[in-house]
């Protein structure tokens, strides 16, 4: 018993140390003040709740797993990643044979509805988990979420650090998104939601339905309670609250990159609702400040978290002060007193106990027996894809055979990636590639990738001449375009001579000494930095380099000079950086790539 208790405590301590991470690339804590964004990472459509002195946040995860990542804070500025609510999809609660609750001839969708197996074999880009709401009610944490192709589901737990229950599907409907529950002062439960025009054929309207007290089912059909076509176009992202005799719906409108934050209020859940814009960009550099949730602290202050769309960096998280005036919230700073605030970029910290200065996990030394919380796959992961070797301090990625319909890495389910952590950072990985010598058709490859709807990867590829290093680019990968090898070089077992030469696609690749299998260890690096534009939203680009010894670095160059890749966002998400190991021919065993460490620095 004593040994078991000690082991449990060591495990818990390991998880806590893993979760509390001091970032080497971004720090919003300025002492007595903070700087936005508080999280320079793609936690899209954030929502927040408070339980005692603790704050919890979740966000959209779309087709990435583990999904519905959970963050925790005690001061609203420093956030730690503590877990994820969704490890599988669509979950045991989904019933393919169940008739649709809401479906009409006017409803449409983009392509066929992905089935349960599709979520494990092919990335369903942009589908899945949209705009969740997190709430604490009667001793349990609830997350309600919309899937535009399926409907609305709920997951719950009594321990946000632990396992969440399987999803419960409240309504099977096309186009239902952005749900939020409310348990009101009269003992009734409600659910508001929006509608995705791409699936439902209608947008800019909000709905409400009565809900069971346990949040497991709707007690009646949804009905429209607000139409924003004239004044609040593309209104969505509902967050439902009750305060001082009013029901409030916080909703973004105007579009992702250029919209504003709207609030509706009424004396009845069914309306009629008054409307007011409570935050807009104004003369601030924060474009489209909207979609999030508000929270009252234990000390009586009000704060609002929301996102800002920064293109390839994703939708980063901001924290705004909030006050009340004449029964309406005012978010940000309202210098002209018109009741519509503008976002702050630097502001005093909330009146809360100081916590450590940390950010969600980034670097990984792979010293635990489970994959770090910062990593996600673009599909439900298979146990065949990787081995977290705590004893060896490595992450082993096995070469996964890709489908016969594979076109490029956009179709690869076994990419293991994480969000960009800052506007400017460097990622370096030490990897060792061991191809399977039994594969007669040499097709195994692995590498470091910067991934959006276009991508670039510094790749190790097995060939009959040995392992070769390739710089590969794929523009508009989401359209099925082919990869292009921009740089290729055989890797000699001895140190590279100086100066070295590059080989381009314009000519044949000359014979060079291959790297023997037993010595295939390479350091791969990508450096990401912003590219200033005339507007407020920066573009980004990256350069690549490699080393055989971790000391002398060789920059990947093009005929024009340093090779620079123009980074693109993914489908509703920012770009990601990560690793993979693939093959394209069948064999009863695979090769692998061992990742010794993956480090992010400024």
Where are these regions (language model features)?
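Hydrophobic h-region of N-terminal signal peptides that target proteins for export
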Residues: 10-19
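Positively charged n-region of N-terminal signal peptides that target proteins for export
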Residues: 1-5
């Amino acid at each position: 018993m004593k040994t078991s208790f000690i082991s449990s405590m060591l495990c818990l301590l390991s998880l806590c140390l893993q979760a509390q991470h001091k970032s080497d690339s971004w720090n919003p804590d300025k002492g007595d003040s903070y700087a936005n964004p508080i999280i320079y990472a793609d936690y899209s459509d954030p929502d927040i709740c408070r339980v005692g002195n603790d704050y919890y946040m979740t966000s959209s995860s779309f087709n990435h797993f583990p999904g519905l990542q959970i963050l925790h804070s005690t001061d609203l500025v420093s956030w730690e990643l503590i877990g994820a609510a969704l490890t599988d999809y669509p979950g045991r609660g989904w019933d393919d044979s169940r008739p649709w609750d809401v479906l009409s001839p006017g409803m449409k969708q983009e392509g066929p509805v992905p089935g349960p197996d599709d979520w494990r074999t092919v990335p369903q880009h942009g589908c899945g988990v949209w705009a969740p709401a997190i709430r604490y009610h009667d001793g349990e944490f609830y997350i309600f979420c919309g899937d535009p192709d399926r409907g609305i589901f709920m997951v719950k737990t009594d321990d946000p650090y632990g396992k969440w229950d399987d999803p419960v599907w409240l309504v099977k409907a096309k186009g239902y998104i952005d749900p939020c529950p409310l348990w009101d002062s009269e003992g009734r439960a409600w659910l508001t939601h929006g509608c995705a025009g791409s699936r439902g054929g209608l947008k800019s309207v909000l709905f409400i339905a009565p809900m069971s007290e346990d949040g497991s089912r709707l007690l009646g059909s949804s009905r429209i309670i607000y139409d924003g076509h004239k004044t609040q176009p593309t209104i969505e992202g509902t967050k439902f609250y009750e305060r001082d005799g009013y029901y409030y719906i916080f909703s973004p409108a105007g579009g992702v990159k250029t919209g504003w934050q709207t609030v509706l209020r009424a004396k009845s859940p069914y309306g009629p609702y008054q409307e007011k814009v409570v935050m807009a960009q104004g003369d601030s550099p924060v474009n489209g400040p909207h979609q999030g949730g508000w929270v009252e602290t234990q000390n009586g202050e009000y704060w609002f978290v929301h996102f800002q769309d920064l293109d390839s960096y994703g939708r980063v998280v901001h924290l705004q002060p909030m006050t009340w005036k004449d029964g309406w919230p005012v978010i940000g700073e309202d210098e002209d007193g018109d009741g519509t605030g503008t976002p702050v970029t630097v502001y005093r910290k909330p009146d809360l106990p100081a916590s450590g200065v940390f950010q969600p996990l980034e670097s990984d030394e792979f010293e635990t027996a489970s994959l770090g919380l910062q990593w996600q796959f673009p599909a439900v992961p298979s146990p065949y894809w990787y081995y977290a070797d705590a004893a060896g301090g490595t992450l082993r990625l096995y070469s996964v055979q890709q489908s016969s319909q594979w076109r490029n890495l956009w179709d690869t389910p076994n990419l293991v990636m994480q969000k960009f952590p800052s506007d400017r950072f460097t990622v370096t990985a030490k990897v060792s590639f061991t191809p399977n010598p039994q594969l007669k058709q040499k097709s195994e490859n692995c590498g470091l990738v910067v991934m959006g709807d276009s991508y670039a990867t510094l790749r190790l590829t097995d060939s009959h001449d040995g392992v070769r290093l390739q710089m590969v680019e794929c523009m508009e990968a989401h359209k099925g375009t082919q990869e292009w090898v921009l740089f290729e070089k055989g890797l000699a077992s001895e140190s590279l001579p100086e100066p070295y030469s590059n080989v381009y696609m314009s000519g044949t690749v000359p014979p060079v000494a291959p790297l023997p299998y037993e010595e295939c260890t390479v350091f791969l690096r990508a450096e990401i930095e912003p590219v200033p534009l005339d507007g407020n939203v920066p573009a980004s680009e990256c350069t690549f380099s490699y080393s055989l010894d971790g000391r002398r670095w060789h920059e990947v160059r093009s005929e024009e000079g340093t090779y620079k890749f123009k980074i693109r966002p993914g489908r509703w998400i920012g770009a990601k950086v990560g690793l993979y190991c693939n093959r394209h021919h069948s064999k009863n065993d695979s090769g692998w790539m061992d990742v010794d460490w993956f480090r992010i620095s400024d």
